[in-house]
Amino acid sequence: MSRRVAVLVAVVALVLACATSGPALTSSWRAPETQRLQFHRAMTSFVTTDSGLRRSVEDRMATRIPGSFPAYSAVPNLSLTNAARAREQLRGKLFDGAVVVRVIDVGDAKVLPPGQGWYSADPDFASYWSDAWKGEKARTSPAATTGVAVEVVIYTLGNDQLVWAGRTEPTTGSRSVEELVDRSVDVVMRELRSTHHIR
């Protein structure tokens, strides 16, 4: 695992821990061989069908994660339905890492709860990317901001492997999706820095 990959993992974990009054990180996992996350170029992506919200969140994520760029502007025609094509497009733009954030409904029977190996369901970028976007497109209304959690996953694109995953605790108070994601990313980044996955 390269040093850049290790740094990126650390940065994202730290993002999930910074907010003093924000959500807490309830579960996280890292690949055993991952010591520090360091990517040359990492893509940030927020899974939502709301294009304006996606741009706003991806822009803010890119300011928090060193060496990262928002997917919507770096690869405007990035495939959301064909994971193999998406990975090919990203590699073509010299991306070697992907940080993907999505809001999940903890009441959804398809969402595995923390502590039950939820992160093992998608060990590679291709499977996660496809599942995440298919699930989002199936929503009939925007995600609520109460009773949901934020999930952050980091993949290396070179060998198409999951290197870090984390989820926040379910929200109990209503807040905007942007605020929820902002605070969650802060929590992840703090976690990543505290565990020395990033500097």
Question: Which sequence ranges carry the predicted segments?
Answer:
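Alpha-helix termination/capping residues and helix-transition junctions
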Residues: 12-15, 36, 92
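Surface-exposed short loop/turn segments
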Residues: 83-154
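N-terminal segment of the mature soluble domain
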Residues: 38-113
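C-terminal/domain-edge helix-coil "capping" segments
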Residues: 18-39, 49, 130-199
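Residues at beta-strand starts and edge strands
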Residues: 5-8, 40, 97, 146-148
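Sec-dependent bacterial lipoprotein signal peptides
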Residues: 1-18
